């Protein structure tokens, strides 16, 4: 008799979860913190509620759109992940391991047994089917994935250029990570730790800076505004294209166009327009290892022995110079 109000309590909890899943998750499956690891945590929180309902025979009390939203979140995460199951370390994200992610996919596959892509990742390709597309855009969340394969030999770029987000997000609109033939060639700087005192916060704030991401700054300052708008997304054809625009600073707008040419190489065009004055700085976070460079030719070339190398060639107005700066990568 002391649990006579249990149905009302249960309904209240389910109503709160259903409300939150609609508040926190955009219609493209992206979680509103725009942080891959927080996104992953949110998936599992919502899934645990389903697991408890299943254990007690109350699954039917969850509306279908609750399940549909979780499934779309899983597919979002699968798309932005790299072939080795790791994730871009945008915002406050930490690097996941393949072992951890296979375990997650196995649990998700039990919830969504008809989803062949989830089954594929759960079984490491032994069962299921990969998505029938390569590149994929999530326009509301502002995540865009160019790829020419789902395999380890893929060329894959993940671009982050979304709306204004929340505490776990960083001022990094336009940044990207690039995977090539088994290696992440433009790793994000990461986040260090969530919070602390003194030197800890100094380190966290260093990792949050716009200037330590693969994007453009004015006078190396953090972006004033982080509200990117997608002007064009064309994920098919010989020249796949993304054009995104952000009102980065007062009186200075940044338009970044990314072209994936012949499924082979990328051309990035950055245009800054406005009356603001100062130094425009284009930042690239290079991977750990030996790098050959030519300041006269504005060129970088990685020197990895395994052959997973890339050449970065920059072009710009007369007077443009190149400077090496220290970089750190927190995973």
Task: Describe these PLM feature segments.
Residues 186-189, 195-197:
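Cytochrome P450 core scaffold surrounding the K-helix E-X-X-R motif
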Residues 153, 166, 194, 223-225:
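Short, acidic Gly/Pro/Ser/Thr-rich loop/turn segments
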Residues 16, 20, 42, 73, ...:
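Alpha-helical packing segments of well-folded alpha/beta enzyme cores
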Residues 3-5, 19, 55, 151-153, ...:
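Secondary-structure boundary elements
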Residues 161, 189, 218:
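Active-site donor-binding loop signature of nucleotide-sugar glycosyltransferases
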Residues 2-25:
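Alpha-helical cores of eukaryotic small-GTPase signaling modules
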Residues 26, 30-186, 235-236, 243:
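Carbohydrate-active enzyme catalytic cores, enriched for enzymes
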Residues 93-94, 98-102, 110, 196-331:
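CBM-like, beta-strand-rich accessory domains located in the C-terminal region of large
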